[in-house]
Amino acid sequence: MKDFSKVRIAIASPAKIREWSFGEVEKPETINYRTLKPEREGLFDERIFGPIKDYECACGKYKRQRYEGKVCERCGVEVTSSKVRRYRMGHIDLATPAAHIWYVKDTPSKIGTLLDLSAAQLEKVLYFSSFLVTDPRNAQKDGRPLRRGELLSDDEYRELRFGRQETYTLPSGTEAAVRDGEYVTRGQVLGGNVVSKMDGLAQYRFPRRAEIAYAEEAEASLPLPSDVLVQQDSFRPGEILAELEGDVQITAPVDGTAFLLDMGEDSVLVELRDSAAEDAAQGEVLARVYIPHGMNVQVAEGEVVEAGSVLATAAAGDRLRVSRDSRLSNVNFPKKKGDVKVTAHWTRRVEYRIEPQMHVLVGDGSEVRKGQKVVGAIDKEEEVIAEADGVITLHAPASIIVSKARVYAYQDEPLVVNGDRVEPGDELADSGNLRSEISGRVEIDLVRKQVRVIESYDFEAKMGAEAVKELLDDLDLDQLEAELSEQMKDNSRHKRAKARKRLEVVRAFKRSGNHPSWMILETVPVMPPDLRPMVQVDGGRFATSDLNDLYRRLINRNNRLKKLIGQGAPDMIIRNEKRMLQEAVDALIDNGRRGSPVTNPGSDRSLRSLTDLLGGKQGRFRQNLLGKRVDYSGRSVIVVGPQLKLHQCGVPKRMALELFKPFLFKVLEEKGEVTNIKQARKMLERYRDTRDSVWDALEEVIEDKVVLLNRAPTLHRLGIQAFEPVLVEGQSIQLHPLVCEAFNADFDGDQMAIHVPLSAQAQAEARIQMLSAHNLLSPANGEPNVKPSRDIILGIFTLTQLRKDNLGAGSEFANEQDALKALDEGRVALNTPIRVNGVETSPGRLKYVFSSPDEAIMAVDRGEIDYQDHVRIRLNGTVYETSAGRVMFRRLVQEALGAQGHLVDTLVNLDTAYEKDSLKDMVMACYKELGIEATAGLLDALKDSGFKLSTISGITIGIDDIVLPPNKRELLAEADEKLAAIEQNYEFGFMTDEERYKQVVQLWNDTTDEVKNAVFENFSRNYPFNPLWIMSQSGARGNPQQIRQLAGMRGLMARPDGSTIEVPIRASFREGLTVLEYFISTHGARKGGADTALRTADSGYLTRKLVDVAHEVVVRDVDCGTTDYTVMPLGTTDERTGEWRTRKGSEIETAIYGRTLTADVELSDGRVIPAGQMLSLEDVKAITRDAKAIGEVFVRTPLNCRVRAGVCQKCYGYDLSQAKPVSLGEAVGVVAAESIGEPGTQLTMRTFHTGGVAGGGDITMGLPRVIELFEARKPKTQAVVADRDGVVRIEEEEERYLVRIEAEDEAFSSKTPMKISKSLRLIVRDGDHVEAGQPLTRGAINPHDLLLYKDTDAAQRYLVEEVQRVYRSQGVKVHDKHIEVIVRQMLRYVEITDGGDTDLLEGQTVERWEVDQANDALPEGKTPASWKPVLLGITKSSLTTKSWLSAASFQHTTHVLTEASMRGQVDELIGLKENVILGKLIPAGTGLTTVREMQVADERTLEKYGQTSVSTDAVTGSQRYDDTRPSSTSINPSYGD
């Protein structure tokens, strides 16, 4: 026994992983190819994991056990057993944290749930495609504060961290549509068809042209005519100077060369320079004349003019005004009218082309000073120097940069440098007068004297598991719990559901003591090397476990990352390497869970990761923990052993020699045949030379032993039984023919396994509990499973059959003499039924009257009569009309019963021909009346006699034994006539094709039945002793369908889809099939083969699921004390006719046999069966007889039991395999699962097609229906059910019915009608009264609807009845209680509708007892939790179980282990599977604590200890010896010796 009672699973912290480890694995090397020794610091390092050779260090300095525990100073290896390499672990320290993929990819993701991230978001962070904000500080995004835990794309991160700027290239020669330094908005055109994608500051890059607008001014004269009056002293651009009344000319005041200065529009300033100068353009200015807009210039540039020459003209009515690009000031009016002096101001624009090697030194719109360098260049001559003060404008930039920035022009020194980060209000320049308005990064343009602050923020955001770990590290679970509890009060159901999921995870972490950050690995444990071995194969190559490849990949990447970090590699490379490390960790833990799996080089086989080692049929749980290979076992072909007793099996000598070797050694040593084990081993080495003394010793060894025989598949507990071994020659195991049915074995090459229970306790348990003779009744239905069959039935039936002659049948005679005379004359035969003096008899009974059975048997031996002839025999003073064979059979049974032979008449009826069922009833009667020993003896006697009789009867089949009925031809001709009529009606359009098809199928079904009846009538009337007929009638072999096909007609066949082919096979096998008929047959045959294969797999899986859901249900208490009961109706009343219909006897039996009554039942004979009594078969038969008067009985069922994870004896009732109250510790859950699953293969796969009838739908039947019910699935064709009690009101529309249910109280009537399609057939009429949950249409009811609209009881009864309907349709008998045990497990969970003041959350699914426990624990005045029942399918129910070990070994191993470790779940080891996995005794049967604590004592011991009284427990039948001492001793016969 292991000394622990609970097992807890939790997440390992990095510290715990290092604590497990014996050293760090730093290198990916495994073993040296030359020395074949492990490499240091590698995956097989002896310093870390221990020595390869027992008690020997790596260098060989220390050898032998005397140095145990010493660490070699040369090689560093500890001297110890090499077994340590199976459990010593290592570790790998990761260069960067990596997430555990189970907590990432589980649904819902545990890490994602805690951090409120979706699975996709979490994946983006972990695999380096998004940043996770770990510290937002004052960062803003889209005008709101950045949140912690928010995701940022690469671009978003760069924009927020370093500022966003985008460069837009303009096509060559395109003029910009915005100014340099202008703020632009998203969507604004920048130039050509280039549009800005963001708001921000636009800045030119590489302008191709620059234009400087120089501000010019000069004094000039404005000669106007005397009649023009100028009254202002200044004129603005565009202002009117004068309106002319007559023509005007302006003339040159002096001689000179004219130079024209453009002042915009057509206004000019004419400079007259000295013509005598060498270069007139450089000559002295003699005069300047201002010519306003509106005058026509009459002089050309560089023209020499004389004083008085016309410079410009204007016509009368013209307006003179100042040009728009100039203005006039200091207008002086002379005394003499006409010549006005003015100062003219104008802008002179000069354009400069900027080549690529040149660069602008000032910004667009900047003012320039005369002599200032405006454009720099490599070549000094290309530089642009300002000719005068002016303003520069830049044109045609190569590109425009738009950035989120603010530009500040400064005068004084800046107070910041490039790259500095500033916050709002920080000083930038001008002694603190210039301050930043935003957060950002500083860029200083010293040339333009600008400080540019690019909007960005100093915040923390990271990628990968490192970022996630930081958030998990900082999680405040208490605060988060408070926030989520608040969210649970939200009105939104969706928000509450989301909060509940998160709150469950938060509370799980709080209660378990796990820290959320442990879901991120800093250290990876390395499995012990002997669990991931590397072995040398032929050819010098190595075969290695996939894990080594995965570890090697991880170590390589880890080392490479460490190296790159040490070298200061670029961020991009390191990021990629970190992602690859995360993927390597993922592949090690669960290969293929994300992305494509890592495969073997050169093949498509994906490597088996740690997860693959656990899950699936070949995983650790199912392969190694639940199913272990055992020693002391053998396997061989089985052959029949007709000479064996029921409790015996034949074991080949050679096999026994090997199986019992240790015991044999001991006996040989005791006998002095050998002196030591070595000698004994040598003695047994050569089988052929084995001495007789060894065989004698072997006989002695096996004398009091039993062995277990097992045939796969073990579908129920009778698949393993104990037998006493008998040594036989040959190499085959011999099996008793009668146990074949339990094993489902036959002798066509079946093999069986044999096991030896080793300890005395195991031997005792096997002998008492598992001996074949002690398992005569089936646990599924309580009927004998060991019963005569095949040849045995044939022999006994032949013996006890009565011959019937037809010669002179029905003749009447006045007296016996006349009858005997007629016999002598041959008018009647010996066994002809005749009447003598009005009494029915036969000539044989008149002629042969024997005074004793011996006399009759002697007459048979003399050949006077046959065993089957009618005779009269005196027996115990009474004369019986019977046959010699029946008397002979009575004697056989009497001899078999031995000492109890006087009770033979309670078993044998001389009026019966013993066929299959009557023999079964006889075995059952013997079991009940005389017990196990007598029944086993009787069965052996029947076997011996049956085989002998069937042999000497000489019954065999020849082709002539298949007799065709004489009227078959007439029946077929009649059918053809009807067929012609149907076809004619169809041709005339009186019916649809569907109706024709249905009628044709029905016609041939009826005809086939008629032919079958004709076959049977022909056999029974004319050939009563026909071998084929005898075999069929006795139940030995062949059913009516097979006889029909042999001698009648094959009939209709099925298509592969299950529908019927309307062309029948008219021939029988005796006549032979035509080619077409043979072809049609092949359809059905193939479908049968395919169905069987599918059924076997589905049935096995169903059994596995059933065992899983119910394995913990064990009888744990005598009486749970419940007052609940279940009403079992014994019949139904037809609603329309009011007629009572009693249920079939077999149905009543499977419903109430072995149940505890909760109310008295009064029988018509005045007998009362009291409440509290368990119903025996006799009680059930009596109740069935009075079913109509009784109506219904009230019984306890497992559905009402209050015992947690089990049932009590009273609620369960009888153990059907013992026909007595169930024992404490009986694993009734497993028995239930096996009882339902074992016959699963017999169920059909068929979905009955209704031949395409509209609205008929497909009715799922057989195995798929059973699976559908146990999985609580929505049926394919679902019935609409009433949602309340009331009266049905139906309105008909074109395509549907509107159904409303009116309740008695108007307030409860349905407001909106149910819309029912006309394709669903209504089964209620307008005005019918219905109850909630009653179906309104054809189809199967959805059990969830029953639970919703009615109650738990209705759902339970429906599930039980529907499963039974399928089993009964196939003739399989299963007791209701087995189905109830499973249904109870499906309904053990509830959904919380309001948590009240408990810790339970709305929407949570928990076991019912948990809610009761939580509510009971509340102090007074607090609100208890409320709930509603939920129906879970068996798969869901198995996975929801409290036992994580059981759930993980069932399905979805990773999900179960993820959940359990997060919750720090404790397995209380209540069920069977958990204990099998841990190698503990299962808590059932003899392993149950209460049973193990019982002490078995004999009378003498009791007297010695002074016991005073003996009392018998009414329920268990166990005797208790009560005493004043606290440790009373009790005996339970079920487990005693």
From Swiss-Prot:
DNA-dependent RNA polymerase catalyzes the transcription of DNA into RNA using the four ribonucleoside triphosphates as substrates. GO terms for biological process: DNA-templated transcription. Residues 1502-1537 are annotated as: Disordered. It holds the Pfam family RNA_pol_Rpb1_1. HAMAP family: RNApol_bact_RpoC (MF_01322). The RNAP catalytic core consists of 2 alpha, 1 beta, 1 beta' and 1 omega subunit. When a sigma factor is associated with the core the holoenzyme is formed, which can initiate transcription. Its cofactor is Mg(2+); Zn(2+). InterPro entries: DNA-dir_RpoC_beta_prime (IPR045867), DNA-dir_RpoC_beta_prime_bact (IPR012754), RNA_pol_asu (IPR000722), RNA_pol_N (IPR006592), RNA_pol_Rpb1_1 (IPR007080), RNA_pol_Rpb1_3 (IPR007066), RNA_pol_Rpb1_3_sf (IPR042102), RNA_pol_Rpb1_4 (IPR007083). This is DNA-directed RNA polymerase subunit beta'. It catalyses: RNA(n) + a ribonucleoside 5'-triphosphate = RNA(n+1) + diphosphate. GO terms for molecular function: DNA binding; DNA-directed RNA polymerase activity; magnesium ion binding; zinc ion binding. One of its GO terms (cellular component) is DNA-directed RNA polymerase complex. Mg(2+) binds at residues 746, 748, 750. Residues 1506-1519, 1526-1537 have a biased composition (Polar residues). Binds 1 Mg(2+) ion per subunit. CDD domains: RNAP_beta'_C, RNAP_beta'_N. Belongs to the RNA polymerase beta' chain family. Zn(2+) 2 binds at residues 1120, 1201, 1208, 1211.
